[in-house]
């Protein structure tokens, strides 16, 4: 062991930092601390000194490599890394690696140092972001200090600095994902800064707590569109609260929001809810002439995600009067129906549309989409329609129809094989 360290020190004297890293990697280091017992305290101290030298003088890759080794050298690395992190004259890249590594240690001194870095108005953005991420990695030990940063101060001279610090604190709490982070996050859902409210709502959405559902519902009416959007996203995953909090009726008004992004997220949420009431709300907006095309695409996607009899019937109705772009989307989505009980219905909808004589059905792209979707659904009732499309004058339609027929034929053969084997065995 002493030989490896001697070689590493010789390489350091020659400023060959790549070789120093290679020698340090050969030491019997544990996953986090020196758990092997093969290195003496003196040897560990030597290894730490060499690793810190690489951090100071190596290139980016060498710093990256040695930063992965440092946590394996135990608690002894904390003090020199804190010295680097707190030295404002030190190279910012070296400080970044030091702070990132310190995020592995649940040490009060580490928490305080990282918090001070966040509070310092002169800290550059990359260092501040790293500090927030490192604090997030530290978990519950960092929550108390981060909570203090959320308290509004009379920052008359530097309100933007205070806002940025508090925003980073919220983002750090969001990464912790522990129930202890809920209370401090609840304190800022009504913050005067929309960015902080948005970050808090996004963070709280990952927790299963009855209070949070009520907070998200209230946030649907926030004046900031980013907050409304995050609230809709959060509620879309709370299907367990669907009936108790009447979430469909809470989300429905957002389908007519002034922000198209909020409208689209509301559509996604209603699609995830998958109820007939949600499908009805989606369809009402879909058939409105005032609804933008981009939102109509999201509405039909949401109806398809619901995958219910009612939602498929609404999609069928949409085929009768929608623009070609929307029709193509509906046809494609019908081909992706997974429910065995609804595949036959989706197939029948496509066949009826093909024979409806609507203007859209004469477009090659529409016929091609129908052929592809019928092939994906794999229902025998589609054979006649596909044979018609296989005789189409457009080559691309013909090729897709033939491919779909082959897929149906293969599927039919595969499904009949188990039956044939059973008959042979019984015979």
Give the ranges of each region predicted by the language model.
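Structural detector for internal amphipathic alpha-helices that build alpha-solenoid repeat scaffolds
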Residues: 6-10, 22-42, 53, 62-75, ...
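Short inter-helical turns and helix N-cap capping residues of alpha-solenoid HEAT/ARM repeat scaffolds
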Residues: 13-16, 32, 58-59, 88-91, ...
């Amino acid at each position: 062991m002493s030989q490896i360290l001697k070689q590493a020190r010789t390489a350091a004297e020659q400023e060959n930092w790549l070789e120093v890293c290679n020698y340090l990697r050969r030491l019997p280091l544990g996953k986090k601390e020196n758990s092997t017992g093969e290195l003496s305290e003196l040897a560990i101290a030597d290894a730490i000194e060499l690793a810190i030298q690489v951090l100071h003088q190596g290139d980016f890759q060498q710093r990256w490599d040695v930063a992965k080794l440092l946590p394996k050298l135990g608690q002894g690395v904390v003090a020199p890394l804190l010295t680097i992190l707190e030295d404002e004259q030190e190279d910012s890249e070296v400080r970044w690696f030091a702070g990132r590594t310190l995020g592995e240690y649940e040490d009060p001194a580490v928490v305080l140092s990282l918090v001070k870095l966040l509070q310092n108005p002169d800290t550059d953005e990359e260092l501040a972001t790293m500090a927030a991420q490192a604090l997030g990695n530290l978990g519950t030990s960092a929550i108390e200090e981060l909570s203090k940063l959320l308290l509004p101060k009379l920052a008359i001279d530097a309100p933007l600095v205070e806002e940025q610090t508090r925003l980073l604190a919220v983002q750090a709490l969001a990464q912790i994902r522990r129930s202890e982070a809920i209370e401090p996050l609840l304190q800022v859902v009504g913050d005067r800064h929309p960015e902080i409210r948005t970050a808090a709502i996004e963070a709280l959405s990952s927790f299963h707590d009855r209070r949070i559902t009520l907070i998200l519902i209230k946030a649907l009416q926030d004046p900031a569109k980013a907050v409304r959007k995050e609230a809709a996203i959060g509620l879309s995953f709370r299907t367990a609260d669907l009936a108790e909090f009447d979430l469909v009726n809470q989300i429905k008004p957002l389908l007519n929001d002034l922000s198209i992004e909020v409208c689209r997220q509301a559509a996604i949420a209603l699609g995830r809810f998958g109820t007939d009431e949600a499908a009805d709300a989606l369809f009402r907006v879909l058939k409105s002439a005032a609804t933008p095309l981009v939102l109509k695409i999201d509405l039909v996607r949401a109806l398809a995600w619901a995958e219910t009899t009612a939602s498929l019937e609404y999609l069928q109705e949409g085929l009768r009067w929608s623009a070609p772009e929307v029709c193509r989307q509906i046809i494609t989505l019908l081909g992706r129906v997974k429910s065995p009980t609804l595949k036959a219905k989706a197939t029948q909808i496509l066949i009826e549309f093909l024979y409806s004589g609507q203007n859209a059905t004469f477009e090659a792209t529409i016929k091609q989409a129908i052929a592809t979707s019928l092939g994906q659904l794999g229902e025998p009732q589609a054979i006649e329609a596909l044979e018609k499309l296989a005789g189409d004058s457009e080559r691309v339609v013909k090729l897709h129809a033939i491919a779909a027929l082959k897929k149906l034929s293969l599927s039919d053969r595969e499904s009949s094989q188990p039956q044939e084997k059973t008959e042979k065995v019984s015979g």
